[in-house]
Amino acid sequence: MSTYLSNKLRAISFLSIVLVVILHSQLLVYSKGNSFHLQQFLTSEVTRISVPFFFYISGFLLFYNCKTLNYSWYCSKLKKRVRSLLVPFLIWSISGFTIVYSIKFILPSAFNSYQGLEKYQLVDFLQALLWNPVGCYQLWFVRDLFLCVSISPILYGGLKILKELFLLLLFLLWFFDIQYVISIESVLFVTIGAYMALNHKTLAEKVNSEGSVLLQGILWIVFCVWDYSCPFYNIIHGMGLLLGMSFVWGLYDVVYVRTLGRFSNCKVYRYTFFIFVFHEPILTLVKGILLKLAMSQTGILLIYFSAPILVVGICLICARRLKKYFPLVYRIICGGRSQ
């Protein structure tokens, strides 16, 4: 893989995690009027490209050097993902549950979305730790990604035997929101990434022109606005996501050329995974504190935009300190990601 493409994937991954934090900072239940509509537009449309991007990049990297899928390749990839995905999932899931449970024990009114924790039975505890994490709900992505790696031979076989038809079938399931165990969005975009890695590596290296990127950006905004009144929401929303991803992918090329690569390898990109796993429940706590100061819809909107900046800043400070003074701990909780 070229240095250009490697840096591009890291930069887009960092942008995606920033969008995830903005997505999770929404305060729609407290909002109305212009504040509500702006948050709805950003939360339900613009920031939604972040999760598919993560899955796409993960699928691309998983299959990038795969010439043929055999038992040795599968065991090697699964072993690496146990360290990089499963171990961090368990650590952060247990930590998130412990934090929320402890805070609710001291302040029962905190974390209103997690009622009845004190009544949990063994099955509830296991589900909260292994399937639907409490406090760190964003870990569902890590869970689904590990499951996608586990079924990678099926995805590989589908692409090799059915080729583009396999992608079409997954697209249809996604457009019509047909779900089963693993999110269909997870499976689809991991598979798209795998398809590109197996068949179109050179296309991923292609530098997009400013004209095509501008057109994609305009169309993306049109589709985002169109979503609100369209009776075929899933289809239009899905097409908007694809346009948005294509736009951001090409936008990197434009920014790289315009800035002479100034932002191609920023040091903050190395903390993407830590921000992802650490931003909750920190973000919920920050929003709860700031909401007590909000006196108007303008105040709520300011919280919506300022909370992500504050939380990302906290995450970066904590990541740097942890990596500096406890490098082994940092590597373990981040799945070996130290660079």
Locate the predicted segments by residue.
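Aromatic-anchored segments of alpha-helical transmembrane domains
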Residues: 18-25, 167-181, 216-229, 281
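Interfacial loop-to-helix transition and helix-capping segments at the boundaries
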Residues: 39-51, 130-144, 174-192, 207, ...
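Hydrophobic transmembrane alpha-helices
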Residues: 60-64, 148, 152-156, 186-202, ...
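Alpha-helical transmembrane segments and terminal signal-anchor/GPI-anchor hydrophobic tails
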Residues: 202-274, 281-290, 297-304
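Membrane-cytosol interface segments of multi-pass membrane proteins
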Residues: 1-170, 296-339
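Solvent-exposed interhelical
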Residues: 147-171, 178, 195-214
